[in-house]
Amino acid sequence: MLFTKISSIPVNQHFQDMPRRKDSRSSTRHAPEFSGVIRPNGRIWVSAEQFYRAAEQIWTTEGVDLNAFVFPLIVNYALCAELSLKAAEGGAVGGGLTPDGLVKAAKIMSTAHGHNLSDVFASLELPTQSAIESEFLAASGEQLAPLLAECSDYFIQARYAYEQIGGSYNLSGIRTLAKGLLDAVKALSTRNP
C-alpha cells in the first residue's frame, strides 16, 4: 500500500557527506549499516501520522480550551514534523535471509537523528530536501524554511516546558508544519518510486 516501491539509490551513498551531530554524543554515534535501499519509510510515517491525529483530536474537539493543552499540542505536532522528516529517508538494519531461507529480524531506522527540525532537515540528502520543499509548498501553500526555522526547537522546549522560563509558540505554524510535512513525505514516496 503506502511506501512499497523500491528505488535504486545505493545505500552507502547517503552517509558519505551526512553532517555529524553537534552535541557531545557525536563521537559515539555512527551511521548504521542499512540493508537494501534508503527511501521513504511507511512505518516511521505512520508513527508521525498518529502524533498528528492525537493533536488534531484536541484541536478539533468542540468546546476544548486550547490554552489548557498548549504543550501536548506542540509536542505532538512537533514530533509529527520530526518523524515525517525522518520517514523521508528510512531503511532497515539487519534483515536478509537465514541459510534456511527465513527472513531475519530487522530494525527500522532513519538516516536522520536528533530533535532539532532544522538539523534533521539539513541531514537529509539534497534531492530529498528539494523534493520535500516542493511537496510542502504544494500541500500547504507555504514556504517550508520560515516555519522550519521558527518551530525547529518546539519539541525540545515543550516536552519539558517546566524547565523553560517564558517563551511563546506559534500553534498555527507548528500545525501547518506538521500537516505539510506529513503530506509532503507521503507525496514524495508515491511520486518518486
Model-derived regions: residue spans:
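Long, charged low-complexity segments
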Residues: 3-52, 56, 95-193
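A structural signal for alpha-helical segments
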Residues: 43, 68-75, 169
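Short, hydrophobic, well-ordered secondary-structure elements
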Residues: 49, 70-92
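Helix-loop segments that flank and shape redox-cofactor active sites
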Residues: 56-69
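Short regulatory "switch" loops immediately downstream of catalytic or recognition motifs
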Residues: 58-61, 90-96
